[in-house]
Each structure stands twice: as structure tokens, then as C-alpha cells.
Regions:
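N-terminal alpha-helical targeting/anchoring segments
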Residues: 1-119, 132
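TRNA-recognition modules of translation machinery and tRNA-sensing kinases, especially anticodon-binding
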Residues: 114-395
Length: 395
């Protein structure tokens, strides 16, 4: 969540920044709710101070004391309601976008930063026509937007995840196999709830949710903790689940947009003064992984209005898909500044014993979409970098 104390001290700056992502109204509602709470707080303090009487009270004083208690109970109830309203409003305000985040409200407003590699024509076939991908049986077993990845194509995917994890471990990341069912607090702390709750699967009997990214458990694992050492670098492999409730009619063929997919994720905890350098380093790792597979791509700076609730800035890397004749997103890399850590109650010891809020970042190191890009760009030939991890030379 945003720092409400900082917002009180400089509301105009916060409002102007949040307006870039269409959240000025949400900020106004927060400030109004906070103003009411702050107005009621001293009233409660004053009424509590008036509850004591000196010496033996007269009947008139007892009657006055009874009236004060009734008034105190009423104002305390108002204060509790105001605090709940303020906290609910605070939960809905997204992170403040960084000044360098691109202007605009949609994915079409993203600003291209660079391109790498030659965007070739391919052989005209989509990935589902090249690899062993069975969407029909996936639909029979699980419904639409599910599929089986089989045989050599499955080996390519396994090799891809091994390739990414091997690189990240060599870069100093700690490998993690996280849980994929989490409590609501974990989804709230990472900023996915309440704004995107409809996008995630709920196991209602156990009050658990299937994660859409291992970013969630990698942040929640330090929830309500004080960290003694920064930075922390984690990488995780997990299955991910998304309802894709807003994707009706989009990418209905193949595995590009599905309800279940695999992903290798990076998560970093660091100090505020180091987080922007860390953001660039994570982007460089993503680029290096794609370059190692000789996949053409472009990097874009996401528009402020298209950022996730938690992100202050995000880079997307879009790989070239020749059968679609366009670049499509295969990674994202976000700096969430102190937003997730503040929501999750995570702090660290800064300069001795003082406590501060760390910055957290996340980025994609590999997903099933990379396998699709490999199939389309090379017509079934598999990069040597993956053959070293068990992939066949061709599928």
C-alpha cells in the first residue's frame, strides 16, 4: 500500500501521480476517509479523559458521567467504522507510478525501448501445428483453455525451466519450490486482492487461492517479518493459475493464453536506494536468457495506466511470433517499490537498529510461451542451449 503519512504531507503530488494511472478518484476517497478518521480520533481521546471523577460524585455528576459514557461509546463506534472505511479505501489505491513509467492507459501506449535479433518469417506454422500440443484432450479433461504438452515438446519445456534456473542460481538467486495454494492475506499483501480477485481460483472449503505467479508465495514467505540482511534473491518454479476472466475471445487457439501454465519467477528484496539498479539488472538477465536461445524480441516500457496495482514501473519483453506476424509478451519485470512490503508487514533493519520498509521486485525468467516462440521461430529445431538440459534437437 502507499505510505499514507507521506500522502498526507504531500497530497497534491500523490494525486497527480496516481491520476496518470486513472486512480485520482480512489486517492480522493482515501483522503476523505482519512480526514474523517483523524477528526474523530481526538474526540474519542477527549471523551476518554472525561471519564474520571474526583472524590465522591454527586447524583448530577453521575448522570453526566453516564451521558459521557454513552457519547464515548457512540463516537468510538463512529471511529471504528471510519477506520475500517479508511483501511478499505487504502487497500484500493494502487502504487504510485514512477516518473519514468510511460504515459498512457493501455497496452497500446507502451513505449518501445529496444529490439534485438532479426524478426524472420518462420515457415508459416503456429506452435500448435509444430509441437506436440493437445488442446482437444485438454478441453475434454479440464475445459477450455487447458492443454497437454507431450513428448519432445514437454522435454523442451522441462529443459527451458532448467536452463533458466541454472542461470539464476549462478547469478546468486536461491532456488525455491513454493506452495501454489495460499491464504487470502498473501494475495492481499502482494496487491492482487482486492482489485483482481475475480481473476483467481478459490478453494472455498479451505479458504485458499491458487496463485497466478510464484511472486505471491515468495513475498508472503516473509510476511510480518523483520529482515536482518538485504538484498535477498529468490527464483522459483511453479504451476500458475488464472481464470482469464477478461480474456473472452482473445487467443482462443493454442497454449498462449490458458488457465494453467508453468513459470520460473525472480523475486528480489532490496533497499530503496538500490532497487532501480536491481530492476535494470533483472531486465538484463531476462534479455540474456532470450538471447541465449536466439529469440528475437523487443523491450517496452509499460504505460502507467496499464501497470498492475503493485507496480511502480514495469518492463515487458515481447518475443517475435512469426506465424502471428507480431511481438507478444513473454516476460514482465516490475519494481513494486515499498508497496508489497508495506501491505505485507515486511521491514528491515537499516543502519543499525532503525526499521525501514524494503523494496520488492519481480520478473519472469521463463514460461510456456517461450516454448511456443521457439517452435514458431525455428520450425521445430531446438536451440543448443536447451539440448544441454535434455531437450531434443528437433520436435
Amino acid at each position: 500500500m502507499i505510505d499514507i503519512r507521506a500522502a498526507r504531507n504531500d497530497p497534491e503530488r500523490f494525486r497527480a501521480a496516481l491520476a496518470r494511472r486513472g486512480a485520482a478518484t480512489a486517492f480522493d476517497e482515501l483522503m476523505a476517509a482519512d480526514a474523517l478518521w483523524r477528526e474523530l480520533l481526538p474526540q474519542v481521546d477527549d471523551l476518554r479523559a472525561q471519564q474520571k471523577l474526583q472524590g465522591k460524585p454527586t447524583p448530577e455528576q453521575l448522570e453526566e458521567l453516564r451521558a459521557r459514557k454513552e457519547r464515548l461509546a457512540a463516537v468510538e463506534a463512529e471511529l471504528a467504522a471510519a477506520e475500517a472505511a479508511r483501511d478499505a479505501a487504502l487497500a484500493k489505491v494502487p502504487n504510485v507510478p514512477h516518473d519514468s513509467a510511460a504515459d498512457g492507459m493501455t497496452e497500446d501506449d507502451a513505449v518501445e525501448i529496444k529490439r534485438w535479433g532479426e524478426a524472420g518469417p518462420g515457415d508459416g506454422r503456429e506452435a500448435s501445428e509444430i509441437g506436440q500440443i493437445d488442446m482437444e484432450r485438454g478441453a475434454k479433461v479440464s475445459g477450455s483453455r487447458f492443454g497437454f504438452i507431450l513428448d519432445g515438446t514437454a522435454l523442451v519445456s522441462f529443459a527451458l525451466y532448467h536452463y533458466a534456473l541454472d542461470r539464476l542460481v549462478n547469478e546468486g538467486f536461491t532456488a525455491v519450490l513454493p506452495p501454489v495454494l495460499v491464504r487470502e492475506e498473501a494475495m492481499y499483501g502482494t496487491g492482487f486482492f482486492p482489485s483482481d480477485k475475480a481473476d483467481y481460483y478459490e478453494v472455498t472449503a479451505d479458504k485458499l487461492y491458487l496463485v497466478g505467479t510464484s511472486e505471491v508465495p515468495l513475498i508472503a514467505m516473509h510476511m510480518d517479518e523483520i529482515l536482518d540482511m538485504l538484498p535477498l534473491h529468490y527464483c522459483a518454479f511453479s504451476s500458475c493459475f488464472r481464470r482469464e476472466s477478461g480474456a473472452a475471445g482473445r487467443d482462443t487457439r493454442g497454449l498462449f493464453r490458458v488457465h494453467q501454465f508453468q513459470k520460473v519467477e525472480m523475486v528480489v528484496y532490496t533497499t530503496p536506494d538500490a532497487s532501480w539498479d536491481e530492476h535494470e539488472r533483472m531486465l538484463a538477465i531476462e534479455e540474456s536468457l532470450l538471447q541465449g536461445l536466439d529469440l528475437p524480441y523487443r523491450v517496452v516500457n509499460t504505460a502507467a495506466g496499464d501497470l498492475s496495482s503493485a507496480a511502480a514501473k514495469r518492463y515487458d519483453i515481447e518475443a517475435w511470433f512469426p506465424a502471428q506476424d507480431r511481438y507478444r509478451e513473454v516476460t514482465s519485470c516490475s519494481n513494486t517499490t515499498d508497496y508489497q512490503a508495506r501491505r505485507s508487514g515486511i521491514r528491515y533493519r537499516a543502519g543499525g537498529k532503525s526499521l525501514d520498509t524494503p523494496h520488492t521486485l519481480n520478473g519472469t525468467a521463463a514460461t510456456d510461451r517461450w516454448t511456443l516462440a521457439i517452435l514458431e521461430n525455428f520450425g521445430g529445431a531446438i536451440p543448443e542451449a536447451l539440448q544441454r538440459f535434455g531437450a531434443p534437437a528437433r520436435v
